[in-house]
C-alpha cells in the first residue's frame, strides 16, 4: 500500500464544538478542507494503529464523497478496519451503538443534525470516542490547534468502496466492512423496550402517525415500526 503525503495549508475556521464541525457544504467543498480536518482528528489521537473505525452519516448531500475520503485517509493513517453503514448511512445513536457493540476505537459521524441539507445547505463531521459519545473538550481543543498548523495529510490511491454492497472489501491493506445500518440498533431497541407489548397494542387497533422527515429516521422507522412491530 503506497501512502501519499499531500501538502496543504491551514484553514482558520475549523474549530469543532460538541456537535463537531458544521459548515456550509460549499465550505467543505473547498480544496483539502475535509482532508485537513480529518487529518487533524487523526493527529490528535493515539493508539489506534490496527484498530476499528466506524463511519456513517445521515445521507445528506456530500455524505458519500466525504466518506470515501475518510476511508482512504483512515487506511493511510493506520486503522486496520472500517465499519461503514450501507449507503454511507448511520444515525447518530446507531453509530454510537455500533462503536460500543463492535468495540471500535471511535467513529466519524457525518451529520449536521436538523440543519437543512443540499448543495446550498449544511454539512458536518463529528468524532465520537470508544464509548460512543462525543469527543471530550481535550480532544476537540487538540483538533482545533492542529488545524491551525497542519501542512500535510495522508491518503492512499485506491478505488471507491462500493457502499451499497453489504460485505467485506478492502481499501489498500485496510479491511472495509459495509454493514446493515439498522440491524444492530434495532436489536438494541428490542432489549430496551417490550416489543411484544407494543405489537399487541398495534394489533388491538391502535393507530399512530410518524413523521420521518428528519435526517436519517426513515430506514429505522421501516425496520422497527413496520418490519418488527407492524
Indicate where each model-derived feature is located.
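Glycine-rich phosphate/diphosphate-binding loop of Rossmann-like nucleotide-binding domains
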Residues: 31-44, 48, 56-69, 74-76, ...
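Generic structural signal for well-ordered alpha-helical scaffold segments
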Residues: 39-46, 96, 100, 190-197
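Short strand-loop junctions, especially beta-strand C-caps/beta-turns
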Residues: 21, 26, 56-60, 130, ...
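Positively charged, low-complexity intrinsically disordered leader regions
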Residues: 1-38
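Well-ordered alpha-helical segments embedded in enzymatic catalytic cores
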Residues: 33-40, 94, 185-188
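Ferredoxin-reductase
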Residues: 48-134
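Gly/Ser/Thr-enriched, mixed-charge loops and adjacent short helices
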Residues: 2-11, 32, 119-230
